[in-house]
């Protein structure tokens, strides 16, 4: 049993660097290399979607020098890796609140998405300047605007309709969430979409995450009985 959609909270870059007496940015550089390896590995498996939590809205409260470095690293990674993603038939999508991005970042995101949008292999989702609460709020705001313009009535509102206004509404919800670094929390990531997601916590810091760790998470998923509110007996039928 392989999950259709795997999401990963890539945590631990800073701690990885600190344990080695290195600046935090060294951890982020090491983490970026792991992203490339794991995407390549995931693309070889029968996964449909891989979503990576790269930068949260709350991360903007970090020291400005670190935020600037991360934005530069993301931009550079997009420039360097888009052609390789395209060659591997990977479709790239970047989700999140993009109002904080400069023109260079916005242009590169558009270029990368346009180049890969017709690819039929792994769908790679990068959550950049994203948070689960923001996602829910923007969905509410869009629905409220439709009601205001008389394009929608409150009587028609439902969980199913609301879900259509969230990011990734056209994709299956995550079956498996992997959280690295030993922390055990969602960190405001895809709060609506994780309603029935299986969660795997690994002590591995993100720069130490590898193909074996990924396979361990997939093995954990295969042990789970997904019930979606039903009894075990109902599921077994």
Swiss-Prot record:
It catalyses: 8 isopentenyl diphosphate + (2E,6E)-farnesyl diphosphate = di-trans,octa-cis-undecaprenyl diphosphate + 8 diphosphate. GO terms for molecular function: ditrans,polycis-undecaprenyl-diphosphate synthase [(2E,6E)-farnesyl-diphosphate specific] activity; magnesium ion binding. Substrate binds at residues 12-16, 24, 28, 56-58, 62, 179, 185-187. Its cofactor is Mg(2+). InterPro entries: UPP_synth-like, UPP_synth-like_CS, UPP_synth-like_sf. Its EC number is 2.5.1.31. It comes from the Bacteria. GO terms for cellular component: cytosol. One of its GO terms (biological process) is polyprenol biosynthetic process. PROSITE patterns: UPP_SYNTHASE. It is an enzyme of class 2 (transferase). Keywords: Cell shape, Cell wall biogenesis/degradation, Magnesium, Metal-binding, Peptidoglycan synthesis, Transferase. It holds the Pfam family Prenyltransf. Binds 2 magnesium ions per subunit. Mg(2+) binds at residues 11, 198. The active site is at 11, 59 (proton acceptor). Catalyzes the sequential condensation of isopentenyl diphosphate (IPP) with (2E,6E)-farnesyl diphosphate (E,E-FPP) to yield (2Z,6Z,10Z,14Z,18Z,22Z,26Z,30Z,34E,38E)-undecaprenyl diphosphate (di-trans,octa-cis-UPP). UPP is the precursor of glycosyl carrier lipid in the biosynthesis of bacterial cell wall polysaccharide components such as peptidoglycan and lipopolysaccharide. Homodimer. Belongs to the UPP synthase family. This is Ditrans,polycis-undecaprenyl-diphosphate synthase ((2E,6E)-farnesyl-diphosphate specific). It comes from Coxiella burnetii (strain RSA 493 / Nine Mile phase I).
